[in-house]
């Protein structure tokens, strides 16, 4: 995902699809025929759900980061965070379906050649990000892939992350090889949360373009009320405050960034030119918590090579 969007202020932080749908509010739609809400209502509800779950994940992350030591309290906080994260990932996948329904509302049926063309274009433009999230969610739902937390500690800092658990051909449990490179990496929250915030705006930008083309409305300066934007603004602030300490392999990927300016503006972007806004760590202690199943005795810890640890 290579993308940049400028937000003039947090009171005007709505993704572009909101403005596009407000501009097209008086255009005839077929939502009732499809037994769907008005397209603006669909998007508002979907965005609200994503933002609400993002907020919950940030709250649980903050609680987890404040825990010192190991044991029962940390285990409970880890589990609460992973539950909130799982819920956020579900909402992101549902958001893609909701965006498709928004676009459907502008056409009498899906056989319309214009719908097919616009949907195909929207799907193609957002496929890489959607596939990334959907693969994680599908693995969790259909292959018993559990989310597991991983922590790196070093003097003066730490980095929280997670991986999707899988089983390799030798029966070793560890990071899923179809999701994590080599079955030995993980996702840092620092990158992951920035990526998903960027993804919300990335998908919305492409949806907005499709809405303008479907409705015939020209992009303009349609005013959008700031009412209700506070929750989104809080998430933006929260994500920007997560220390940008990425896992080692992530420094080779596109770097998502949330940059708050002194004038109140925000730049949300993803690209390799953001490398100066992120850092990794040279060495650290690692903590991983697996769940026993009464049978498995071999586990692989992220970033510690291909060898399995026996328990």
Predicted ranges, named:
Residues 82-124:
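Flexible secondary-structure boundary motifs
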Residues 1-82, 112-311:
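Acidic, Ser/Thr/Gly/Pro-rich intrinsically disordered interaction regions
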């Amino acid at each position: 995902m290579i993308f940049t969007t400028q937000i003039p202020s947090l009171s005007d932080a709505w993704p572009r699809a909101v403005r596009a749908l407000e501009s097209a509010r008086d255009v005839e739609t077929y939502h009732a025929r499809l037994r769907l809400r008005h397209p603006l209502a669909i998007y508002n509800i979907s965005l609200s759900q994503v933002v609400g779950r993002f907020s919950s994940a940030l709250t649980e992350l903050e609680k987890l980061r404040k825990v010192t030591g190991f044991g029962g309290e940390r285990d409970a906080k880890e589990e609460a965070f992973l539950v909130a994260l799982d819920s956020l990932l579900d909402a992101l996948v549902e958001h893609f379906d909701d965006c498709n329904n928004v676009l459907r509302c502008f056409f009498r049926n899906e056989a319309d050649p214009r719908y097919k063309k616009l949907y195909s274009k929207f799907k193609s433009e957002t496929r890489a990000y959607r596939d990334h999230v959907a693969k994680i969610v599908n693995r969790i739902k259909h292959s018993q892939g559990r989310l597991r937390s991983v922590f790196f500690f070093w003097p003066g800092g730490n980095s929280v992350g997670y991986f999707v658990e899988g089983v390799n051909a030798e029966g070793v449990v560890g990071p899923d090889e179809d999701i994590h490179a080599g079955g030995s990496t993980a996702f840092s929250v620092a990158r992951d949360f920035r990526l998903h915030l960027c993804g919300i705006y990335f998908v919305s930008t492409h949806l907005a373009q499709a809405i303008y083309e479907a409705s015939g409305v020209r992009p303009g300066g349609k005013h959008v009320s700031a009412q209700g934007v506070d929750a989104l603004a809080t998430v933006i602030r929260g994500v920007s405050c997560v220390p940008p300490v990425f896992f080692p392999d992530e420094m080779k990927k596109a770097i998502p960034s949330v940059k708050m300016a002194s004038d109140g503006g925000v730049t949300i972007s993803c690209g390799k030119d953001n490398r100066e806004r992120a850092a990794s760590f040279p060495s650290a202690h690692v903590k991983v918590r697996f769940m026993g199943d009464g049978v498995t005795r071999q586990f692989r810890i992220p970033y510690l090579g291909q060898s399995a640890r026996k328990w």
